[in-house]
């Protein structure tokens, strides 16, 4: 996709020197989903190291996480796009999820191509999870279920929903989607309650949610299946290697029109955070791609 290529090209440091006056007050870091999900977890992990970076530059400010779920992430993106472009409101974005309006020609309340792109902070792959207490122990079990599967989800604008639709359409399995959950943690929990049969989450989230062994991980769409998922298969094993290309990018942006000086400062703070040894260790331990 041309728009995605353009976004990635923007995720590089600017050559203009950082402006010393920024930041002078707290920065709001908008999270487009509810607490407990992958975007929320990564943002909160980065924040202390961003604050550490700013303190080293002489700015003892706080970076404040602001959860703003709604409309599959579009509520937050519309808010951020209308914020003052002074660097004090930034957001973590779901790509390609937040770009679906642009791709399909629908009005999402913001123009994804006009945001000020600051840095890429993560990439992740998807797994299919079912309840360990249920009968769906494998993809074969799912495909042989004598009805459409029920899939709890955030909504039709989310990347995980798009991933689910790609996977089940490609595999030829009918699906009924149950929308309205505010985070991946919520719709994963819905599977345990029996609201639905299965759902898809990214690898890092699956490992966090499955510490007690409540879930079966029946598929991992990646060239190499994570050794932690002993019963999982990938797209290649299912005869659909193209499914192993389905993934998610986490990118940070601000409103349209931010100055290069402020953007460069935020880029440096995010780079410091994602390259911090403690965050890298956490990412390796939890398989969160940063």
Go through each PLM region and give its residues:
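Ligand-binding clamshell of periplasmic/extracellular solute-binding protein-like
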Residues: 46, 71-74, 87-100, 115, ...
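Sec/Tat signal peptide C-region and signal peptidase I cleavage site
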Residues: 14-20
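Extracytoplasmic "Venus flytrap"
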Residues: 29-45, 69-72, 152-159
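Hinge/capping helix and adjacent helix->loop/strand transition within the periplasmic-binding protein
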Residues: 21, 52, 56-59, 79-89, ...
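Ligand-binding pocket segment of bilobal, Venus flytrap-like solute-binding proteins
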Residues: 69, 152-233
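Bacterial N-terminal signal peptides
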Residues: 5-13
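Short, well-ordered beta-strand elements
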Residues: 25-36, 63-65, 89-92, 148-153
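Early extracytoplasmic/lumenal segment of secretory-pathway proteins
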Residues: 60-75
């Amino acid at each position: 996709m041309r728009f995605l290529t353009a976004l990635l090209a923007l995720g590089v440091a600017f050559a203009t020197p950082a402006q010393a006056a920024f930041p002078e007050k707290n920065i709001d870091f908008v999270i487009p989903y509810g607490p407990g999900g992958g975007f929320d977890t990564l943002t909160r992990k980065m924040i202390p190291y961003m604050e550490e970076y700013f303190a080293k530059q002489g700015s003892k400010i706080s970076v404040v996480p602001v959860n703003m779920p709604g409309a599959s992430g579009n509520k937050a993106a519309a808010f951020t796009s209308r914020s003052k472009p002074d660097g004090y409101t930034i957001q973590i974005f779901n790509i390609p999820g937040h770009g679906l309006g642009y791709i399909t020609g629908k009005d999402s309340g913001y123009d994804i191509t006009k945001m000020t792109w600051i840095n890429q902070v993560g990439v992740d792959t998807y797994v299919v999870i079912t309840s360990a207490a249920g009968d769906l122990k494998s993809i074969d079990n799912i495909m042989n279920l004598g009805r459409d599967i029920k899939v709890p989800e955030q909504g039709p604008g989310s990347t995980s929903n798009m991933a689910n639709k790609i996977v089940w359409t490609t595999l030829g399995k009918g699906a009924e989607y149950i929308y309205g959950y505010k985070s991946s943690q919520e719709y994963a929990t819905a599977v345990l309650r029996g609201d639905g049969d299965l759902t898809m989450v990214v690898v890092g989230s699956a490992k966090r949610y499955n510490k007690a062994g409540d879930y079966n991980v029946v598929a991992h769409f990646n060239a190499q299946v994570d050794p932690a998922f002993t019963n999982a298969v990938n797209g290649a094993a299912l005869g659909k290697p193209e499914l192993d290309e389905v993934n998610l990018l986490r990118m940070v942006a601000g409103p349209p029109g931010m100055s290069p000086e402020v953007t460069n400062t935020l880029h440096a703070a995010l780079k410091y955070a994602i390259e911090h040894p403690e965050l890298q260790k956490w990412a390796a331990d939890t398989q969160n791609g940063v």
